[in-house]
């Protein structure tokens, strides 16, 4: 995925001072720092992006190279042309012929620079949208309509940034060339004009609607197809649905992040579903059937005699078929044996009679209790010794 513009990452314009860049970096770094967002992978990536942008823009030489050649000027492996158009470089990396012509141009009298403001194209920023889904929709798949905050071209100024009836003025610093020459020792280096950002022109009478930005905030409506089997954390990429590019650049992408809401009955674990099934004490002891919910409707679960609390029964094929993989998951039902409450006098008498019959049989009806009591007895005897 193409890198975002470093100025955009820090939220500053291309004419920002060193102090403004440093202040923006501190604000963004604090916002996305991993210590403040534990376990948030998206914030961790944004923090790395902010740190990388600051390392370049806080260094005068790196910033000059970046302003002139884009990402290729500070990272040859980034690919793409030095002008930011995505072309102009051979397979071996960026073409540095412009660098040498700029450096030696004044020394050997080649004169005049490239002339004329240049309009560097910028790819639009990627957008992220969190979409909440019910478990049923996540499992079966669905189509959702979403409204995404974005920026669109200002209809008042047609993207120029200037008030109707006015035009951008020639930059007084570079005289419309878009470049300025900086003397470094014996060399004269040509670099992007810091005042106009290489455009050669400046908006002096800004459009009141967009305040000279050429773009305004808006919301766009999209229909998103959700494949069956998605889970929390899955991302769906919509190519070209991000922020529009600047100066003819391509648009960014939209990443829809799935977040599945908690369910009344089920908890998901990969392809399997888990649920708690309450069973009364008589059914647990004597056996029977209970009705349990599944995503396909209700089914009867057979409870064998002597079922214990937290015993798990598996209903095969009643889970989820994930996006990646062909195995249909299972539904695991954990038994919760309920102790009766609010007993009548007669019910208490019956339970007391029942308890008396259990004591007469030597505890064989409660193997876990008998085993536990034996262990306690041995522990006390050993402790006394």
UniProtKB/Swiss-Prot annotation:
GO terms under cellular component: cytoplasm
Single Gene Ontology MF annotation: heat shock protein binding
Gene Ontology annotations of biological process type: chaperone cofactor-dependent protein refolding; DNA replication; protein refolding; response to heat
Cofactor(s) it depends on: Zn(2+)
Key word Nucleotide-binding present: no
Cofactor mode of binding and number, as noted: Binds 2 Zn(2+) ions per monomer.
Residue spans of biased composition, Basic and acidic residues class: 232-246
Region of interest (Disordered), residue spans: 232-251
Residues annotated as signal peptide: none
Pfam families reported for this sequence: DnaJ, DnaJ_C, DnaJ_CXXCXGXG
Function comment: Participates actively in the response to hyperosmotic and heat shock by preventing the aggregation of stress-denatured proteins and by disaggregating proteins, also in an autonomous, DnaK-independent fashion. Unfolded proteins bind initially to DnaJ; upon interaction with the DnaJ-bound protein, DnaK hydrolyzes its bound ATP, resulting in the formation of a stable complex. GrpE releases ADP from DnaK; ATP binding to DnaK triggers the release of the substrate protein, thus completing the reaction cycle.
UniProt family annotation: Belongs to the DnaJ family.
NCBIfam families: DnaJ_bact (TIGR02349), PRK10767.1 (NF008035)
Entry note about domains: The J domain is necessary and sufficient to stimulate DnaK ATPase activity. Zinc center 1 plays an important role in the autonomous, DnaK-independent chaperone activity of DnaJ. Zinc center 2 is essential for interaction with DnaK and for DnaJ activity.
Protein name: Chaperone protein DnaJ
Species annotation: Halorhodospira halophila (strain DSM 244 / SL1)
């Amino acid at each position: 995925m193409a890198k975002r513009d470093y100025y955009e990452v820090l939220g500053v314009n291309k004419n920002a001072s060193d102090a403004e860049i440093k202040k923006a970096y501190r604000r963004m770094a604090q916002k996305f720092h991993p210590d403040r967002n534990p376990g948030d992978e998206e914030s961790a990536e944004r923090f790395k992006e902010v740190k990388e942008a600051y390392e370049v823009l806080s260094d005068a030489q790196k910033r000059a190279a970046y302003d002139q050649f884009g990402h290729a000027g500070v990272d040859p492996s980034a690919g793409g042309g030095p002008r930011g158009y995505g072309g102009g470089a051979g397979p071996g990396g960026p073409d540095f012929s412009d660098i040498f012509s700029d450096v030696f141009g004044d020394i050997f009298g080649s004169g005049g620079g490239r002339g004329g403001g240049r309009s560097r194209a910028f790819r639009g920023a990627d957008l992220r949208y969190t979409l909440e889904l019910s478990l049923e929709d996540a499992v079966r798949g669905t189509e959702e309509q979403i409204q995404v905050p974005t920026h669109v071209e200002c209809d008042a100024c047609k993207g120029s940034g200037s008030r109707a009836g006015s035009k951008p003025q020639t930059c007084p610093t570079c005289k419309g060339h878009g470049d300025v020459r900086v003397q470094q020792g014996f060399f004269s280096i040509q670099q992007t004009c810091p005042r106009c950002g290489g455009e050669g022109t400046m908006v002096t009478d800004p459009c009141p609607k967009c305040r000279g930005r050429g773009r305004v905030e808006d919301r766009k409506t999209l229909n998103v197809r959700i494949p069956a089997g998605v889970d929390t954390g899955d991302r769906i990429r919509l190519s070209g649905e991000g922020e529009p590019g600047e100066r003819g650049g391509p648009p960014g992408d939209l990443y829809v992040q799935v977040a599945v809401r908690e369910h009344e009955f089920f908890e998901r674990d990969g392809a399997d579903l888990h649920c708690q099934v309450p069973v009364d004490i008589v059914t647990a002891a004597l056996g029977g059937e209970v009705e349990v919910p599944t995503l396909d409707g209700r089914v009867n679960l057979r409870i064998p005699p002597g079922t214990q609390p937290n015993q798990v029964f598996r209903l095969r094929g009643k889970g989820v078929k994930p996006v990646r993989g062909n195995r249909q998951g299972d539904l695991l039902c954990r038994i919760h044996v309920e102790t009766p409450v609010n007993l009548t006098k007669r019910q208490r008498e019956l339970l007391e009679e029942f308890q008396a019959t259990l004591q007469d049989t030597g505890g064989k009806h409660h193997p876990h209790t008998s085993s536990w009591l034996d262990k306690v007895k041995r522990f006390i005897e050993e402790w006394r010794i």
